[in-house]
Amino acid sequence: MKRIFVQNRELVVPGTLLAQGPYKNGRGTFREGSRIYSTVIGLVDIKGNTIRVIPLEGPYIPEVGDNVIGKIVDVKFSSWVVDIGAPYPANLKIQDFTDEKIDLLRTDLRKFFDIGDIIYAKVKAITEVNNIDLTTKGMPFNGGPLKGGQIVKITPSRVPRVIGRGGSMINMIKKLTMTRIIVGQNGWIWVSGKNDALEKLAIEAILKIDKESHTRGLTDRIKALLLSRLQELKEKGVIEEIPKLEEEPQGEDEVNGNDGEARGA
């Protein structure tokens, strides 16, 4: 019998029966016969026939296909070492950065990405010994480097809450604060604003979501916070007008009711 016993984004504890049948068990789960159970306290993530549980706490555990924000921490002969907040560093090989033929004997890879640069990449592969391979091919801005702005780090399991249903939450923050924001599924978020005040406001909203992610009425509270702060900035002459939302974001009263994905700016 093929059956799923939980809802997507449902909070579960170790030992919770998740599914039965020919499903693939991902991270945070184990299989016993035909049944799949949770091994951690976290949120259920169902994609196609794969079921995994994203831990509420702890380091980011990458999955193939995740879009992540990373920081270059070392430059080697034919690759870069990238910190993505996982237990192990990731690798970006030159062939996963460009199709252009590069003469490695005559080319210093620092001309593309240097130590300290922030990039936007996709998890391409993970080996059995936890080697993590990234690719920037096909990514917005060709993967970077992302200039200026700040990196905000939140709990990875709360990324869908920051994004909201259909991108409603993150789009509201970007619209009202007039900032560029890229959310990585590793919980690293790049925020770049027109000025320091708006950038700090966007970060304040993101950190509030991280702190209150499992509470009801969060969308309305974030909107109220943004509008209140923007009114203060207008009165101080920092901004001329408060941006208007084209559509009112739908409330997200369900504590676990999120299906957002971490996508580009």
From Swiss-Prot:
Main localization, broad class: cytoplasm
UniProt keyword Heme, yes or no: no
Cellular component, GO, one term: cytoplasm
Pfam families reported for this sequence: ECR1_N_2, KH_6, RRP4_S1
Record-annotated S1 motif domain positions: 65-137
KH domain segment(s): 147-205
Alphabetical list of InterPro entries matching this protein: Exosome_RNA_bind1/RRP40/RRP4, KH_dom, KH_dom_type_1, KH_dom_type_1_sf, NA-bd_OB-fold, Rrp4, RRP4_N, RRP4_S1
Primary role: Non-catalytic component of the exosome, which is a complex involved in RNA degradation. Increases the RNA binding and the efficiency of RNA degradation. Confers strong poly(A) specificity to the exosome.
Quaternary structure note: Component of the archaeal exosome complex. Forms a trimer of Rrp4 and/or Csl4 subunits. The trimer associates with a hexameric ring-like arrangement composed of 3 Rrp41-Rrp42 heterodimers.
NCBIfam families: PRK04163.1-1
The protein, known as: Exosome complex component Rrp4
Organism of this sequence: Pyrococcus abyssi (strain GE5 / Orsay)
Gene name tied to this protein: rrp4
